[in-house]
Amino acid sequence: MASSLMSNAATTMAAATTTAQANMVAPFNGLKSVSAFPVTRKNNDITSVASNGGRVQCMQVWPPLGKKKFETLSYLPPLSEESLMKEVQYLLNNGWVPCLEFEPTHGFVYREHGNTPGYYDGRYWTMWKLPMFGCTDPSQVVAELEEAKKAYPEAFIRIIGFDNVRQVQCISFIAYKPASYDA
């Protein structure tokens, strides 16, 4: 008797559950038609990419031997005072913290202690004072640059910009090359 009551209750509960589930979830009708999506075919022919009149063979490579280049803007002539102020203003407009670094011997990446990148391969320079937190005027940064040039006239000096929110270096460029360096 007890087993028949139990089976009747289980059957009633299962029927109620199936009805509730059918009302809650829509039935699966299949995927949408493929014809509703636009399809474009890509052409893998490289000749269709060049739009300069077929002069692709005329491009030249910068000679890597005897012409050491460093970082951003190093392929340009030395920055004028006005250009330097504009670069520093760009750095400040983006909310980055300016900082000066100098390297008295090597202004470029080099390998001295092995063939893998490491601490002593020219990537890490000496910081000039502290980062200029709260700096709002490019002339403050240029004044620090002039002070660093007086203290280390034979050093390479670069200006970097840190994003203190993301904690990354966002910009870096050589602001001063020593007179003894022949580019």
Swiss-Prot record:
Lyase recorded as keyword: no
InterPro entries referenced in this protein's UniProt entry, alphabetically: RuBisCO_ssu, RuBisCO_ssu_dom, RuBisCO_ssu_N, RuBisCO_ssu_sf
Entry superkingdom: Eukaryota
Protein's UniProt keywords contain Transit peptide: yes
Induction: Expressed at intermediate levels.
UniProt keyword list: Calvin cycle, Carbon dioxide fixation, Chloroplast, Photorespiration, Photosynthesis, Plastid, Transit peptide
Coiled coil: none
Gene Ontology MF terms in the entry: ribulose-bisphosphate carboxylase activity
Subcellular compartments: Plastid, Chloroplast
Transit peptide (first-last residue): 1-57
GO cellular component, one term: chloroplast
One Pfam family, short name: RuBisCO_small
GO biological process entries: photorespiration; reductive pentose-phosphate cycle
Miscellaneous comment: The basic functional RuBisCO is composed of a large chain homodimer in a 'head-to-tail' conformation. In form I RuBisCO this homodimer is arranged in a barrel-like tetramer with the small subunits forming a tetrameric 'cap' on each end of the 'barrel'.
Family according to the record: Belongs to the RuBisCO small chain family.
Role, per record: RuBisCO catalyzes two reactions: the carboxylation of D-ribulose 1,5-bisphosphate, the primary event in carbon dioxide fixation, as well as the oxidative fragmentation of the pentose substrate. Both reactions occur simultaneously and in competition at the same active site. Although the small subunit is not catalytic it is essential for maximal activity.
Subunit record text: Heterohexadecamer of 8 large and 8 small subunits.
The protein's name in its UniProt record: Ribulose bisphosphate carboxylase small subunit, chloroplastic 3
Originating organism: Mesembryanthemum crystallinum (Common ice plant)
Classification lineage: Eukaryota, Viridiplantae, Streptophyta, Embryophyta, Tracheophyta
